[in-house]
């Protein structure tokens, strides 16, 4: 009876996330928005500071203006232009309970290469010792983040960076009004 109200602990270990989205742009164009070394990378195009730490080894660091005091480190794990791109990311200091995230994008050409299906797979590692409720919260946030990442990629590839900027601003303003 005493254990009935005890918090249920979540299993430790990585959590996988998978999502996909069709984008009306060529796989090479979409790839350029994913590639940290490209000036067309979505965050570079949005004006965020992306620093090349070691281009030969694929190490990059991003500083987001809206998050002073945080750095986002990226280590490219695979890069096949127009086909796949992968990296491991870490945020310092840690935000929430996420330790790191392994991201992999597969680009499948459709319609004679004028569009593509983007398959996104992520493996997140969270701090150990989470309750099931805490892990469920983190999984919800990560699922939303994965979807939003693909949505930004789609908007950037199909409508340009200004459309991403406008969509982001509209979202921020909506949150302010609703709060």
Model-derived regions, located:
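Hydrophobic ligand-binding cavity/cleft-lining segments
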Residues: 1-56, 178-179
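Short beta-strand segments that buttress and anchor functional surface loops
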Residues: 7, 58-66, 87-94
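Short, surface-exposed coil-to-beta transition loops
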Residues: 16-18, 69-74, 98-104
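A short, structured loop/turn motif at beta-sheet edges
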Residues: 24-28, 77-84, 106-117, 147, ...
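Short glycine/serine/proline-enriched coil/turn segments at secondary-structure junctions
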Residues: 52, 67-68, 94-98
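Beta-strand/loop substructures that line and gate deep hydrophobic ligand-binding cavities in soluble
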Residues: 91-151, 164-166
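Short, highly charged C-terminal tails/helix-capping segments
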Residues: 152-179
């Amino acid at each position: 009876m005493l254990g009935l109200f005890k918090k249920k602990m979540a299993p430790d270990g990585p959590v996988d996330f998978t999502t996909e989205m069709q984008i009306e742009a060529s796989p090479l164009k979409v790839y350029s928005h994913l590639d940290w070394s490209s000036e067309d990378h979505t965050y570079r195009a949005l004006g965020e500071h992306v620093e090349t730490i070691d281009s030969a080894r694929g190490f990059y660091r991003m500083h987001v203006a809206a998050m002073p005091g945080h750095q986002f480190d990226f280590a490219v794990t695979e890069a096949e232009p127009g086909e796949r791109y992968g990296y491991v990311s870490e945020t310092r200091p840690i935000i929430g309970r996420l330790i790191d995230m392994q991201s992999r994008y597969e680009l499948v050409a459709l319609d004679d290469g004028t569009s593509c299906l983007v398959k996104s797979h992520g493996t997140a590692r969270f701090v150990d010792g989470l309750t099931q409720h805490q892990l469920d919260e983190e999984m919800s946030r990560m699922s939303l983040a994965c979807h939003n990442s693909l949505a930004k990629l789609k908007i950037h590839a199909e409508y340009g960076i200004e459309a991403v900027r406008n969509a982001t601003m509209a979202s921020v303003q909506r949150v302010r009004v609703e709060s």
